[in-house]
Amino acid sequence: MSHDVITRFAPSPTGHLHLGGARTALFNWLYAKHNNGKFLLRIEDTDKKRSSQELIDSIINAMSWLKIHYDGKAVLQSENISRHVEIANQLMLNNKAYYCYCSEEEINKEKEESAKKGLYYKHNCIWKNKSAPNSNITRVVRLKSPTDGVTSFDDEVYGNITVNNSQLDDMILLRSDNTPTYLLSVVVDDHDMNISHIIRGTDHLTNTARQLLIYNALEWDPPKFAHIPLIHDENGNKLSKRHQAIGIHEYKNSGILPEAIFNYLLRMGWSHENDEVITIDQAIRWFSIEGIGQSPSRLDSKKLEFLNNHYINITDNETILNMIIPIIEEKTGHIITDVKKGYLLKGLSELKKRTKNLVNLAKESLFYVEDIPISIDQESITVIKDYKHIFSILYDNLSKISEKDWNHNILMSIIKDISCNLEVKISIVYHCLRASITGRMNAPSIIEIMINLQHKECLQRIKYALDVI
């Protein structure tokens, strides 16, 4: 494999890392890893009013959580401004750029007139081939774009892309305060970082055509481009601003495992045969740009739930326990004892089968770690009140079992005997046990729970239900 593949992820720290950005980072990382190349991180922080160190840290932490690790040191675009200005001045010296003295008011008026006529607006600067005015008025630096012909490139996903140069204006390179624009900065940084491949969303297609004009003016070889379809909502519509703003940290806080998000993002626009569950090692081995489709991918909450459940279930119980204990302790306000952790550890295998996420799992696990009195829902309270006579018999019979005989066969035998002797359905006896021991009706196998909680804890909970409720 080539060692010359260098990709990059270049987020703007004006918000948290969201799904679209994370997928872009993932695809660039995978392509570099697959080709034994390098994956670089550039923080495009030139918008100082909206950028912050907190958001930079948030983006890097989210990438690290997803196990998307960049090579070397993160580059801050703001530290390269002098280089960007240098290149703009070089274009001026080579007559590839010019000073534009048109005022903002003049340009806005032109835009309004074009809009009224329903025409595409393209600024035609009167200063393109004129000498500078005598007065010291505000100016910007614009690229001298070709007025005819086409700009075309071979996109790695969509094939040949052609844009008429008549649609491309003389873009601003330096603003009136001498700060570089995004389009110039990106080209210079990608060139200086030796970026070989740029994988990004189709919303950048127009930017690519414009950036190629800068590459041509500088006589630099451009990188290869691969534009990936955008992510749509579950109905196939463009994502709303609310959806776009959901950060990776919010998925983390809702109890989604990083492996699930990784797998979910991977399958958004890329496929390998009919595989749905794909490990990181498999993704690195299989990833190719040829596997990226041309149609927009859709959010699919059910698929994310499926993947998260899968990864929760294949993760060992000790690891999952350590993940949910902080959630439980925050919810209850209590430190969970080692004894209670032991109860929960025994019951995790069953609880994991039913869960969607870690937050849900923590909630479903509460009955294992609660002290008496445990929380009991209204349905369970009704059961306890309606079948007091059964609780009395349950307590008497279960009290006669020794700790060492507290096992599945003996417990089942007692439950069947009570059902038979009282002439009630066995499900009623199960309901009574669930109500008093777990405080809810939708718990896993009550026999398994009783074995996990052990003799003393179960009897204390049944006794509380019998005497207090």
From Swiss-Prot:
Keyword set, alphabetical order: Aminoacyl-tRNA synthetase, ATP-binding, Cytoplasm, Ligase, Nucleotide-binding, Protein biosynthesis
Catalytic activity annotation: tRNA(Glu) + L-glutamate + ATP = L-glutamyl-tRNA(Glu) + AMP + diphosphate
'HIGH' region (motif): residue ranges: 11-21
A single cellular component GO annotation: cytosol
Subcellular locations according to the entry: Cytoplasm
GO biological process, one term: glutamyl-tRNA aminoacylation
Positions that bind ATP: K241
Gene3D superfamilies per UniProt: 1.10.10.350, HUPs
GO MF annotation list: ATP binding; glutamate-tRNA ligase activity; tRNA binding; zinc ion binding
Residue ranges annotated as motif 'KMSKS' region: 238-242
InterPro entries the record matches: aa-tRNA-synth_I_cd-bd, aa-tRNA-synth_I_codon-bd_sub2, aa-tRNA-synth_I_CS, aa_tRNA-synth_I_cd-bd_sf, Glu-tRNA-ligase_bac/mito, Glu/Gln-tRNA-synth, Glu/Gln-tRNA-synth_Ib_cat-dom, GluQ/Sye
Major subcellular location class: cytoplasm
Uppermost EC category: ligase
E.C. no: 6.1.1.17
Database matches in CDD domains: GluRS_core (cd00808)
Keyword Nucleotide-binding: yes
Summary of the function given for this chain in its UniProt record: Catalyzes the attachment of glutamate to tRNA(Glu) in a two-step reaction: glutamate is first activated by ATP to form Glu-AMP and then transferred to the acceptor end of tRNA(Glu).
Entry's family note: Belongs to the class-I aminoacyl-tRNA synthetase family. Glutamate--tRNA ligase type 1 subfamily.
Record NCBIfam families: gltX_bact
Binding partners and assembly: Monomer.
PANTHER family attached to this UniProt entry: GLUTAMATE--TRNA LIGASE, GLUTAMATE--TRNA LIGASE, MITOCHONDRIAL-RELATED
Protein name according to UniProt: Glutamate--tRNA ligase 1
Record organism: Ehrlichia canis (strain Jake)
Gene name of the record: gltX1
